[in-house]
């Protein structure tokens, strides 16, 4: 089982430190925070080659959450759209040097929830993803798109629309299934998971109370994770605990891993 944490969950600015913490907490996978590649022209980034070497030495599998802050792959503004694609590709290039084999991105959004705008935004996203997938394939990096909550400003109105969009890529585009997001959405986890399962290679796990994206440790919200343990324990992909709440401590992270592994 490949299971671990998002970089933000570990509350450190050092990737090497995050790798060490991941191992200490019982994980074997770390998801890098792609936005660091862009912040202040990469001022906070460690050399990717040294990250790769340290990860291999510690037997840690690396994935990356591609940049999403101020990024919109569905933007109608050409300059923002082009810069968003450029930013994603820059992060993938850095990630490949660091040794990642899988990367996650957000779909983007629309300023108003209108059928015409949603249709056009999906076309923009499709074109952006064609560029990104072509580059990622050369780097041998798999790209996963994350299911949103399907709120007012999302470019997909529901999970069925999201599923139809993914099918259009003929298997080249995979899914990062976010349990917390699915719990908030109208159709819920069960329906969403069953629909998207053929495309899921990556999972984000965190808890909430079904109303907002709280990113709590397992058991602190209202998701009944016992229902999904068989799926998770037999899952061939990567599982990332995205527990970013300031209320949760490292003991909570460790316990969340143990719950999924069946150690508690």
Protein language model features and the residues they cover:
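Active-site acidic/histidine proton-transfer and metal-coordination neighborhood
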Residues: 16-17, 56-57, 74-174
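Active-site-proximal loop/turn and secondary-structure-junction residues that shape catalytic pockets
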Residues: 9-11, 34-36, 68-70, 107-111, ...
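Short, solvent-exposed loop/turn segments at secondary-structure boundaries
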Residues: 41-45, 74-79, 115-120, 154-157, ...
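Hydrophobic faces of well-ordered beta-strands that scaffold small-molecule active sites
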Residues: 3-7, 30-32, 62-66, 103-105, ...
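N-terminal pre-domain/capping segments
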Residues: 1-92, 96-97, 261-264
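Histidine-acidic metal/acid-base catalytic patches
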Residues: 1-2, 16-23, 101, 156-177, ...
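Catalytic-core regions built around general acid/base machinery
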Residues: 46-59, 128-135, 192, 227-231
